[in-house]
């Protein structure tokens, strides 16, 4: 009986998570553009309130990026560890 695991799928999933984290920058910039378009709400683009909102938004996106990227790395590492363990166990049974 042969059991086949698709460790490449796990690695690809981790890579996808990391790619999605990377694409957050485009979303961040689009939101900043919308905020600046509606900057009158905060008293103008140069106002402390508007700039404070943009700064906080940037911090939030940075945290999300870092967490998503780290999670993707962990998924890839787990897939790699499983593949190595499977290979070691499989070769010991041969």
From Swiss-Prot:
Domain of life: Bacteria
Family: Belongs to the WXG100 family. ESAT-6 subfamily.
Primary subcellular site in the record, as a coarse category: secreted
Lineage: Bacteria, Bacillati, Actinomycetota, Actinomycetes, Mycobacteriales
General remark: Potent T-cell antigen that could be a subunit vaccine candidate.
Subcellular location as annotated: Secreted
UniProt feature coiled coil, ranges: none
Subunit architecture: Forms a tight 1:1 complex with EsxW. The complex is destabilized at low pH. Unfolding of the proteins is required for dissociation of the complex and membrane binding.
Any single Gene Ontology cellular-component annotation: peptidoglycan-based cell wall
Gene3D superfamilies reported in the protein's UniProt record: ESAT-6-like
Free-text function comment from the UniProt entry: Probable virulence factor. In mice, elicits increased levels of IFN-gamma, IL-12 and IgG(2a), indicating a dominant Th1 host immune response.
Protein's UniProt name: ESAT-6-like protein EsxV
Source organism: Mycobacterium tuberculosis (strain ATCC 25618 / H37Rv)
Pfam families: WXG100
Keywords linked to the UniProt accession: Secreted, Virulence
